[in-house]
């Protein structure tokens, strides 16, 4: 399988995102700011490339909005990336579309999250760091926990 490049954007002009996608510089755009349905529809008119919308899960309304997002995939997180904080994952029992799970994941938590909620993918940053740097042992333990529980 080919490794796909993902550009992460926070409130970037849709024209800029589309230009990078259409030129083949990136394969997928992850929208991690306040991009709403109108923004995504506008971006859709400029490109047909895959879009991931990051949604901060703060309450039932934020999850309901994620459910109807026009993005191809949803990344559910507790806040701005890299905080290491989880949201109340039990709300995922009622979420019916493909999603990436982020926030509060680490080698000790990802296995149970994958086994119970079956996300399409998981996203991790600070959960595999030691003293602010990626830790190879934590990365290996994280991947092993996902593989063990992804059945």
List each language-model region with its residue ranges:
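Structural motif corresponding to the early beta-alpha repeats
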Residues: 1-21, 27-37, 52
């Amino acid at each position: 399988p080919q490794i796909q490049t993902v550009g992460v954007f926070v409130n970037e002009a849709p024209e800029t995102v589309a230009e990078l996608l259409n030129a083949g510089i990136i394969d997928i755009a992850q929208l991690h700011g306040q991009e709403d349905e109108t923004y995504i529809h506008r971006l859709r008119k400029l490109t047909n490339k895959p879009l991931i919308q990051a949604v901060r899960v703060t309450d039932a309304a934020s999850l309901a909005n994620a459910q109807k997002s026009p993005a191809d995939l949803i990344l559910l997180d507790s806040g701005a990336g890299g905080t290491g904080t989880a949201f109340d994952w039990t709300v995922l029992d009622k979420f019916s579309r493909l999603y990436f799970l982020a926030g509060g994941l680490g080698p000790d938590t990802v296995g149970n999250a994958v086994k119970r909620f079956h996300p399409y993918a998981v996203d991790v940053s600070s959960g595999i760091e030691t003293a602010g740097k990626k830790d190879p042992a934590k990365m290996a333990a994280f991947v092993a926990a996902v593989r063990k529980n992804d059945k």
